[in-house]
């Protein structure tokens, strides 16, 4: 069977069988319930079915159906865009309710970040073994005061421990992309900060994105711009939390971001409460 890879779906198929086996081995899928994004021609999928308890795969390209025929009842393939799916509904329909899932995928380069954020915000996914553009992988692992350190670095490291499995040269794919790739394994933290409420996690993500809004600007300027607050109020917050007014987001560690984000939203709530009280007093 012939299939012409579609550029609009970012289709680059890994040719190296030994590397495919290594990816599945490192993913440690024995007896687990697994999600695969983009099974493609099924090379990786076939190996997964030999290890997994159940496999739910999402394929956006229906022309790949002839390649995705397996002699097992352990797999279900949904021909749809993973990003548009109600994952909770899909998971409840196929797996047991409140199950823990492992995810595996060769991510399309052009939507890697979008998929990562969906994975991050899906609590059922406890680990993910991912092939991605090397540049994006370096950002995920980046540390403070490095050029690759950004909001994605902080947010991903907040939720997951990141292990680098292997770099993959571009010639190992068909068609050959212009850039190299890397395989990473993301394992959800079991530490205290990851037991925060959903609202606390959303606040953290909101704060980190705001802090890196314009990387070359100071934290003070970014917070003022995003939250529409006068700098005098933010300087007061900085003084209360012993922050330098010229500090930039790229200088702040993950643990510091955790502490600052909590204090920031407490500060905002107090500010709003104070403004409301002043308004009421003026009306009396």
Swiss-Prot record:
Pfam families registered for this protein in UniProt: RrnaAD
Catalytic reaction list: adenosine(1518)/adenosine(1519) in 16S rRNA + 4 S-adenosyl-L-methionine = N(6)-dimethyladenosine(1518)/N(6)-dimethyladenosine(1519) in 16S rRNA + 4 S-adenosyl-L-homocysteine + 4 H(+)
Binding-site positions, S-adenosyl-L-methionine: 12, 14, 38, 59, 81, 106
EC number: 2.1.1.182
GO cellular component, one term: cytoplasm
Superkingdom as given in the UniProt entry: Bacteria
Subcellular location: Cytoplasm
SMART domains listed in its UniProt record: rADc
Keywords: Cytoplasm, Methyltransferase, RNA-binding, rRNA processing, S-adenosyl-L-methionine, Transferase
InterPro entries reported for this sequence: KsgA/Erm, rRNA_Ade_diMease-like_C, rRNA_Ade_Mease_Trfase_CS, rRNA_Ade_methylase_Trfase_N, rRNA_adenine_dimethylase, SAM-dependent_MTases_sf
Cross-referenced SUPFAM superfamilies: S-adenosyl-L-methionine-dependent methyltransferases (SSF53335)
One Gene Ontology molecular-function label: RNA binding
Similarity-based family: Belongs to the class I-like SAM-binding methyltransferase superfamily. rRNA adenine N(6)-methyltransferase family. RsmA subfamily.
HAMAP family membership: 16SrRNA_methyltr_A (MF_00607)
Function: Specifically dimethylates two adjacent adenosines (A1518 and A1519) in the loop of a conserved hairpin near the 3'-end of 16S rRNA in the 30S particle. May play a critical role in biogenesis of 30S subunits.
Name of protein: Ribosomal RNA small subunit methyltransferase A
The encoding gene: rsmA
